[in-house]
Every structure is written in structure tokens, then in C-alpha cells.
């Protein structure tokens, strides 16, 4: 099937959902060669992926994933980004996840090691003492104990190994950069999802709706795959099956502007120190952007009527020590070392 799909996509023809799902199933089952996968991904990138294609790819990846047994998704939130923005910031969405959890929002964060950055979410969590390699049958236990669980993507998507060589060798962004945040095996009902290009906010929000998400904000701000404090943020929000687009500015919520340079990170130990400082209540640009993103996650989780209310809950989560306590609980629940 993939050979026929390469020919169709190379001529500019969109794939049907069945065709797209079939190609991804071939890739996930090791039935396509690296050359075929690389050719397909490159042709698809040149044509441009449709919402229907991306949704079909995501469904096929989810079908090939290691299952996680949890109750119905409900208000569980994932704070995740595509990466690839090249900004080299500290792990903002990971910090926001602990703040949201401290405000009472169950968080199932899907992530990986650094690919386009020096420090991915798994890297910084390990530096903080979290054991990221918990088996699928313990995710529910960890979530109940800590209010937050981390799902290390390679442990749940082993079939991705078949695409690894092709992705490395072609060296360009492909649809797989989008699929990671769309394939959380724990079935989060709400997503705060950052993308590396503002043009992706609307289509990715539509994909999430197609995949059954209840709530989502797909965001890109000032060159970051986050809600930004350095400038306006483009948002596509999914709610009630409808997607609306708008621009927001941190100053609307009383959050001061700051430069991207003030948010620069480094390796795992450096980023862990920054994250710990934020969770311990340190003031400054790092806290400000975490409050903004955590406020959105809390809003998506149903604990606030809007981002402003979410930010108020986020401030309480930090100032009461609840966010830091969620980190402590996660370390204990995963058997890590503080």
C-alpha cells in the first residue's frame, strides 16, 4: 500500500482516511522499508497533510500502542508540545503540569527525551528524581497517588522504531512531529498542545476534535510552542465540538511581558533547577509563563471558567506548596530518588 500512496501523494492527491490509516498500519507493523517511509514522509510534507490524513495516522498509531487501562477520559489533561520551535527554553509545559495537578486537575503527560532540544520532559523528570519507565499497569496507581502520571512515549509506542531510521536520515520535520502529542495512550479528554508553527493551530485543533477530545487549546506564541509572555499567542480552541480561533496576550491577565531569552534553558540538571525554583515559589519570568500555561490547563480541566480564573488557581497551587507536593508524590509513586 505504501508504494501506491507515495505515487498518489507525490502527484498532489490527498489520501482517504482508509488509505492513510493503512499506510500508517504498514509502517507500525514493520512492513515498510526505511526508503519507502522516507519517501512517503517527504512527499507528504511537500503536499501538505490534511486533517483527515493526520487523524487517520493518529488512530493507526493509537491502535498499535501499548494500552493503558484507565477510567473514561473525563477531565484528564495532557500538557504537551510538538517541540521543534528551536527556542531552547526550559520545560515550561512540564512545570505547568505540576501546577495544574496541584490545583486538582488530573494530568496524564505524554512525553519523550529531547529530540529538537537538549532536554525533553523525560530528561528533566529524571533529573528531578522521577522514574519515567513505569509499566502501563501502574499508570492508574501513580495517577491516583500523585494526581499526575508521566507516559514515556517509547514505552507505549514501540512500533515507532520502524520509522526511526527514516526520520533520522531525512532530517526534516514530518507528520510524526505532530503525531506524538496526538497519541497519548491514556486517552486525555483535554489537551493544552503547543505547536511549532501558528499555521498548525487550527488544523491540529480540528484533528483533536476528530479524535474525540472534549476540550483543547492548540497554541503558538512568539515563536514558542507555548502560550507566550514575549508576545501575542495564536489559539485554536476546541469546545463543544466547535473550534474557534483567537489571539490572546499575557497582559490581558495581568501577567507581565518578558523576553524569550529570559526563559532559556540548558541540560536536564539546569532545567530541573529552574523547574524546582518555580515550584518553590520563586518570582520572575519563569513563574509568569508557567502560571499562564497552567492557568489554561486548569481552565481546560474544568476547574475554572476561563484562563484568568485558572491563573488564580495556579497561583494558589504554587504559593500553597501543592504543586511542589505533586512532584514529591510523583517521585515516591514511581519509586524514583529525590
From Swiss-Prot:
Residues reported in the UniProt entry to bind Mg(2+) 2: 225-226
Domain of life: Archaea
Binding-site list for anthranilate 2: 167
Coiled-coil ranges per UniProt: none
Annotated anthranilate 1 binding sites: 81, 112
Keyword Signal set for record: no
Gene Ontology cellular-component terms listed: cytosol
Co-factor: note: Binds 2 magnesium ions per monomer.
Alphabetical UniProt keywords: Amino-acid biosynthesis, Aromatic amino acid biosynthesis, Glycosyltransferase, Magnesium, Metal-binding, Transferase, Tryptophan biosynthesis
EC number: 2.4.2.18
Cofactors: Mg(2+)
Subunit structure: Homodimer.
HAMAP family per record: TrpD
Protein's name according to its UniProt entry: Anthranilate phosphoribosyltransferase
Protein's organism: Methanoculleus marisnigri (strain ATCC 35101 / DSM 1498 / JR1)
Lineage of the species this protein comes from: Archaea, Methanobacteriati, Methanobacteriota, Stenosarchaea group, Methanomicrobia
Gene label: trpD
Amino acid at each position: 500500500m505504501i508504494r501506491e500512496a507515495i505515487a498518489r501523494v507525490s502527484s498532489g492527491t490527498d489520501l482517504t482516511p482508509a488509505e492513510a490509516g493503512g499506510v500508517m498500519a504498514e509502517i507500525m507493523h514493520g512492513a515498510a522499508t526505511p526508503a519507502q517511509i522516507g519517501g512517503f514522509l517527504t512527499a507528504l510534507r511537500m503536499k501538505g497533510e490534511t486533517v483527515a490524513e493526520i487523524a487517520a495516522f493518529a488512530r493507526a498509531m493509537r491502535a498499535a500502542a501499548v494500552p493503558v487501562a484507565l477510567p473514561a477520559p473525563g477531565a484528564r489533561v495532557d500538557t504537551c508540545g510538538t517541540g521543534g520551535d528551536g527556542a531552547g527554553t526550559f520545560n515550561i509545559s512540564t512545570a505547568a503540569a505540576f501546577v495544574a495537578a496541584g490545583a486538582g486537575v488530573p494530568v496524564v503527560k505524554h512525553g519523550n527525551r529531547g529530540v529538537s532540544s537538549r532536554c525533553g520532559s523525560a530528561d528533566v523528570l529524571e533529573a528531578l528524581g522521577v522514574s519515567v519507565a513505569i509499566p502501563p499497569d501502574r499508570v492508574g496507581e501513580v495517577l491516583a497517588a500523585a494526581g499526575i502520571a508521566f507516559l514515556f512515549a517509547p514505552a507505549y509506542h514501540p512500533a515507532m522504531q520502524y520509522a526511526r531510521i527514516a526520520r533520522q536520515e531525512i532530517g526534516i520535520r514530518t507528520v510524526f512531529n505532530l503525531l506524538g502529542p496526538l497519541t497519548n495512550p491514556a486517552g486525555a479528554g483535554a489537551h493544552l498542545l503547543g505547536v511549532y508553527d501558528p499555521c498548525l493551530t487550527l488544523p491540529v485543533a480540528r484533528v483533536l476534535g476528530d479524535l474525540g477530545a472534549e476540550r483543547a487549546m492548540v497554541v503558538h506564541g512568539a515563536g514558542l510552542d507555548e502560550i507566550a509572555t514575549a508576545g501575542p499567542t495564536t489559539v485554536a480552541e476546541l469546545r463543544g465540538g466547535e473550534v474557534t480561533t483567537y489571539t490572546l496576550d499575557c497582559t490581558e491577565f495581568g501577567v507581565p511581558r518578558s523576553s524569550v531569552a529570559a526563559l532559556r534553558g540548558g541540560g536536564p540538571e539546569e532545567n530541573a533547577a529552574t523547574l524546582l525554583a518555580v515550584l518553590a515559589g520563586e518570582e520572575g519570568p519563569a513563574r509568569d509563563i508557567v502560571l499562564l500555561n497552567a492557568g489554561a490547563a486548569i481552565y481546560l480541566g474544568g476547574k475554572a471558567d476561563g484562563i484568568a480564573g485558572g491563573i488564580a488557581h495556579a497561583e494558589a497551587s504554587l504559593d500553597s506548596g501543592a504543586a511542589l507536593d505533586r512532584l514529591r508524590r510523583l517521585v515516591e509513586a514511581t519509586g524514583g530518588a529525590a
